[in-house]
Amino acid sequence: VDNEGPRSTIAKPKGAPIGLEENCLNYARLAPCLAFALALAACSGSSTDASNTAASPGAAGSAAPGGKTIGVSIQDREAQFYQDMEAGMQAEAKKNGYTLIVVDANRDNAKQQSQVEDFISKKVDAIVLTPFDSNAIGSAIVEANSANIPVFTADIANGSSQGKVVSHIASDNVQGGYQAGTLMCAAVGNSGSVAILDQPEVTSVQDRVKGFKQALAKICPAVKVVADPDSGGKRDKANSDMGDILQANKDLKGVFGINDDSALGAVTAIKAAGLSGKVMVVGYDAGPEARAAIASGAMYGDAIQYPAQIGAQTIDAIRDTFAGKTPPAKIATKTGTFTQADAKK
């Protein structure tokens, strides 16, 4: 940005070539000085325009220029997790001078594919996807590849064999699932039957369930999974599915919800059945509402994700790509656990 203000006439040392200003004075009788003023304005005007449209400074240490546009298709912008992730992206994009075009796929694969096509027509500089259907998103990624637009996935990976993704940024969901399983073992006293409110078409959930089952097998092998319906990660569906599970499994001791909405849906069903405190609920994400439920005792605990960090690191990977660097193919962010003891701190 040009902070020097208006250009001023600079005195010339003796012997310097005659400049435009002096020519104007020498030939004042032949041509009005207005010609000089217009010429000078034209010259300085192009410099000012270039200065005003220059890329915004990047984050500290960034070599990448700003002024880039990134298309982001999020599978469900109503989910608290994705709102936090988007906030992390926006904050980091602002530091780097990037513009984000963020759209909601509304849990619709066809809509998400159309959004990618729209990004391509807009000639965005990079695309970020949180695929609704990991196994069906590949064809859209292929289209972006053909347009030479780099593609990144955040939270949920491309589960198909089609398409090239530069980098996948997500929690270590196997580790997070293992931590959730550890909580469940403690919650049910290392024995009994439990359920999983699943979403099997999503790669990150596949990893969570994998880690959860690994923990049960290692820490509390007497605990058995007796039901694992596809609740789609939605609260109302989880509530309905949990009611059915409770009817069919009178001795159920616990349930693992693969995200906070699933867990909170289970809490509602358990309360309606008069089983609060008898069927333990472990969730995943640890958003504000889930933390409040844990603090009140309605839930036993949660595996923690840090969605804002996922969002920020996604933009960092894109920045490195713009700068000609090669980011890691997989970037894992940390996970943790949150229990009632943590709520009291």
Label each residue range with its predicted role.
Residues 41-345:
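A residue-level marker of the well-folded mature domains of exported/periplasmic proteins
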Residues 6-41:
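Sec-dependent bacterial lipoprotein signal peptides
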